[in-house]
Regions:
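Extracytoplasmic/secreted proteins, especially bacterial periplasmic and envelope-associated proteins
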Residues: 80-87, 135, 155, 196
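Aromatic- and glycine-rich peptidoglycan recognition patches
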Residues: 10, 28-36, 146-204
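N-terminal Sec-pathway targeting helices
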Residues: 2-21, 25
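...with weaker cross-activation on analogous glycine-rich loops/strands in unrelated enzymes
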Residues: 105-170
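N-terminal capping segments
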Residues: 24-112
Length: 204
């Protein structure tokens, strides 16, 4: 009788651990993935920041033409991540980048020191970590990966105590447009806790 009870207890523990494990991973899925994207079509407006829309692009590699402003400024390929950040800066800040081309990771100039002017983008450039904390409106630049060698860009939508919320276009077919990253001050510098983020750009 005692052996049966022990076996049942062990089974109960195993089941409980499985439930806890599933709940943790389900929470991560809910935080990072958007099941409603099953119903989106490419070009649907799915989010916005200060009146500037984020459009659904489906798979990361998808392109449906180039967005060029009425005055001839190259905004980018629809609806890549670069297209959104450039359109945001163009519409909200009335800002045109002197160099309007390049992949996402090319927005960051590795030759510059923290706080120097990035002349290609006509924006101040800060490295991650930086002596200057990120703020709303900053353009985050992410390095490339084996899956995505071109990098990624997003906009800081909001700064809260110890964290930032970003908004992005073309994160992937089922990824959310918003993400939250922790921000910590380490040795006098502000660090966004995401190893892919190499730095950020800011309108001076």
């Amino acid at each position: 009788m005692i052996k049966i009870k022990r076996k049942n207890f062990i089974k109960f523990i195993i089941i409980a651990l499985i439930i806890i494990f599933a709940a943790i991973h389900l929470n991560k899925l809910v935080q990072n993935y958007n099941i409603f994207s099953l119903f989106y079509e490419v070009g649907d407006s799915i989010d916005s920041l200060n009146g500037v829309n984020v459009y659904y692009n489906g798979k990361v590699s998808n392109v449906i033409g180039r967005n060029v402003s009425k005055d001839g400024y190259n905004i980018g390929q629809k609806y890549q991540c670069v297209e959104f950040v450039k359109r945001y800066y163009y519409e909200y800040y009335k800002h045109k980048m002197p160099n309007s081309y390049g992949h996402a990771k090319d927005f960051y100039d590795i030759k510059l020191s923290d706080g120097q002017m990035n002349k290609d983008r006509n924006l101040l450039q800060y490295e991650n970590p930086s002596i200057v904390a990120p703020k709303a409106g900053d353009l985050l630049v992410y390095g490339g990966t084996l899956v995505n060698p071109y990098g990624h860009v997003s906009i800081v939508a909001e700064v809260r105590d110890g964290e930032i919320e970003i908004i992005q276009q073309n994160p992937g077919a089922f990824r959310k447009t918003r993400r939250v990253f922790k921000v910590e001050k380490q040795n006098g510098k502000w660090k966004i806790k995401n190893d892919r983020i190499i730095g950020w750009l800011r309108k001076g």
